[in-house]
């Protein structure tokens, strides 16, 4: 799977979509499914004999393309028009398809209540039908939407139903997404043990699928869950695997985030030398991609770790670099923090004259 096939949505969920799906990478530790270009031909025939049906199909195809381009408002308009035409000709299966896709689009746009409404309408049309794939999609949208609305009991209810169907269909990719979503719900509830159980199942499947992008995300999720449980050795084990894959995929931003987590986990274990190693790697990556915020954070982390080792001179060097960068970014808060750390490091060295050079 190529990097271009991965989505950059920042939502912390994994929606399933119609009807052929594949994994894409997203920000903040998530995996998502998207249409591939070939799937549209399976949804709609290229030509229809009935004018209304032909126009409805055209609008549905157009809505799909607009959603893929991130044009959610125009996608909603096209899909609503398509739905009206399918309703006029009484085509219930196509209405269910459009409603399910409207659930996805409104979910993607952050309108979770609308996503729930569309998905519930879709399910009501699917009663007593054998279209398990579409039911699976609608259940996924419902579960993810309820999670964002912090209704975790309903989120679990719908996602467990979704997972059951993925298992019936033996759809490994959708099963992976459902497991990952359930893990995220339990993480939001603070039940990290249950979240880890789902994520561990996700890891087995993603490795079976030989999907490196998906594996990177699942490893990161597992590392985060173990970190939240203060089990830093296990967190480090998963993060280290994750960063190797992220580097091989040239996913520099993800590698940068995981290196930060690795440094923090090592610091929590009082392994300051190893923490410095990871912070330095992150600093190098931040400079390569000209990410000033990550660079500023890395410099601060390095200073703190050097202080922990008693190397105040090196800590001062990092803090001074951080101070210059914070000023260039016009980041008053980071500037004040850097000044405070500089004064403290100078006092620790007994260099009171130098400490007085730093205002604040």
Each language-model region and where it sits:
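TPR/TPR-like (Sel1-like) alpha-helical repeat modules
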Residues: 316-330, 336-360
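Long, mixed-charge, low-complexity intrinsically disordered regions
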Residues: 78, 248-251, 268, 273, ...
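Flexible inter-repeat linkers and adjacent short helices
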Residues: 1-111, 123-124, 353, 357-360
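Short coil/turn linkers that connect adjacent helices within long alpha-helical scaffolds
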Residues: 48-50, 69, 88-91, 125-131, ...
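Conserved alpha-helical positions within TPR/SEL1-like repeat arrays
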Residues: 57-68, 94-108, 133-150, 159, ...
